[in-house]
Amino acid sequence: MYVVSTKQMLNNAQRGGYAVPAFNIHNLETMQVVVETAASMHAPVIIAGTPGTFTHAGTENLMALVSAMAKQYHHPLVIHLDHHTKFDDIAQKVRSGVRSVMIDASHLPFAQNISRVKEVVDFCHRFDVSVEAELGQLGGQEDDVQVNEADAFYTNPVQAREFAEATGIDSLAVAIGTAHGMYARAPALDFSRLENIRQWVNLPLVLHGASGLSTKDIQQTIKLGICKINVATELKNAFSQALKNYLTEHPEATDPRDYLQSAKSAMRDVVSKVIADCGCEGRA
């Protein structure tokens, strides 16, 4: 069909009581698996890329690929800037046709976070681009940004309302105990905090760091207002481990078209499970 923005997609999720998964892609194979699986399950999905991914693949190349695959599979897709921090970088990609942005200024003091985010919102809304921002900060690593667990902090529900009203954002990423990367042990999510945030903020809420969360935890966050679930590390790990296993078992393999099939199969299992956990099958 066409490349769309996240605003209507997440508003539909909020009304319908499900979440839309955002999968961070890193190469053609990741994109193929996400789109093919989503189309077969008739599920809305978001194609997310960090600054590193856009640098690796090229903005114009990614835009062309997403557009072509949306038409090929007759399936609405979103291409989303994940954890972008620089205004000029965001502006350039918006002018190239991107319609969904996450401006991450969560490392800044509250007032500066508002100022930085509002600048991006004011620009993006001129182009009908939806904007997500984060209040609170997750531990772990995303691209080249490393946040020590000791420096991570949770979203303040009262501040969340002020932040949403002052910036004009379309969705809010919250920090309730998740982290980027995989978990050494199951995280203790602060569900009461999430419920409180929901009472103060009527925007679609976003959960980053969902790789490795249990089905039960994911579905509980959705009941409490999460409308977008971000998954990155789980896909990378599935791809990498399957590829390592295949090449160990088949050291003579030299054709990427052959040995990448095992990696795609492993990722397909992850994507289908996340879609099922989010309750969005049949919602596209």
From Swiss-Prot:
Protein name (Swiss-Prot/TrEMBL): D-tagatose-1,6-bisphosphate aldolase subunit GatY
**Cofactor(s) essential for the protein:** Zn(2+)
Pathway assignment reads: Carbohydrate metabolism; D-tagatose 6-phosphate degradation; D-glyceraldehyde 3-phosphate and glycerone phosphate from D-tagatose 6-phosphate: step 2/2
Q: Where is the active site?
A: D82
Q: What is its EC number?
A: 4.1.2.40
Top EC class of this enzyme: lyase
Q: What does this protein do?
A: Catalytic subunit of the tagatose-1,6-bisphosphate aldolase GatYZ, which catalyzes the reversible aldol condensation of dihydroxyacetone phosphate (DHAP or glycerone-phosphate) with glyceraldehyde 3-phosphate (G3P) to produce tagatose 1,6-bisphosphate (TBP). Requires GatZ subunit for full activity and stability. Is involved in the catabolism of galactitol.
This enzyme catalyses: D-tagatofuranose 1,6-bisphosphate = D-glyceraldehyde 3-phosphate + dihydroxyacetone phosphate
The entry marks the following residues as binding Zn(2+), namely: H83, H180, H208
Record text on cofactor binding: Binds 1 zinc ion per subunit.
Organism, per UniProt? Escherichia coli O6:H1 (strain CFT073 / ATCC 700928 / UPEC)
**Quaternary state and partners of this protein?**
Forms a complex with GatZ.
Q: Name one GO biological process term.
A: D-tagatose 6-phosphate catabolic process
Please report which protein family the annotation says this sequence is part of.
Answer: Belongs to the class II fructose-bisphosphate aldolase family. TagBP aldolase GatY subfamily.
Show the SUPFAM superfamilies listed in the entry.
Aldolase
Pfam families linked = F_bP_aldolase
Give the residues the record marks as binding dihydroxyacetone phosphate.
G181, G209, A210, S211, N230, V231, A232, T233
Listed A to Z, the keywords are:
Galactitol metabolism, Lyase, Metal-binding, Zinc
